[in-house]
């Protein structure tokens, strides 16, 4: 099992390869989420971060989805709804030669980068807040679909989580 430091070293290499690919194909991206916070606050990664978060404009995201299989390394897999190999509303770039373990998930996992398309938002602040609240609920439900039953930091959390997992799988 890789240490968090080893995972971050591999992620850095993965990011450099992704950066080269994007420059060669005129795709503009930026770090987001915890990756952006880590780059600014820690001059690298947040100490516990085990993935990279990237965002692209919708046109660059669609370009990436279209050209990726033709020009990127074979030891990578791009998962997305558009490629019919993911249930998430964003892409995930997996490095197939580095498997990672997640004690809370049943999903097979490889080292990965999450790649999010960025679309415009309404001008009304209340609508924006509503969109983000819904997104958070949907994201949690998708995450629970792969979670392990009976696993949690305490018995009560594991019990509640098990009920939520069953609900999330029923809803879809």
Language model feature labels by segment:
Residues 132-137:
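Membrane-anchoring alpha-helices and their flanking helix-loop junctions
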Residues 62-66:
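Short, conserved charged micro-motifs
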């Amino acid at each position: 099992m890789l240490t968090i430091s080893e995972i971050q070293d591999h992620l850095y290499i993965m990011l450099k390869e992704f950066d080269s690919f994007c420059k060669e194909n005129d795709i503009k991206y930026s770090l987001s989420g915890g990756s952006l916070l880590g780059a600014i606050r820690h001059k690298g990664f947040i100490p516990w971060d085990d993935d990279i978060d990237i965002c692209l404009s919708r046109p660059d995201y669609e370009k990436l989805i279209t050209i990726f299989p033709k020009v990127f390394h074979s030891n990578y897999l791009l998962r997305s709804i558009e490629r019919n190999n993911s249930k998430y509303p964003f892409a995930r770039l997996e490095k197939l030669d580095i498997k990672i373990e997640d004690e809370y998930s049943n999903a097979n996992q490889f080292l990965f980068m999450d790649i999010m398309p960025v679309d415009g938002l309404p001008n009304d602040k209340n609508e924006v807040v509503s969109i983000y609240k819904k997104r958070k609920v949907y994201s949690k439900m998708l995450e629970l679909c792969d979670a392990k039953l009976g696993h949690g930091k305490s018995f009560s959390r594991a019990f509640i989580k098990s009920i939520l997992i069953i609900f999330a799988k029923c809803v879809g």
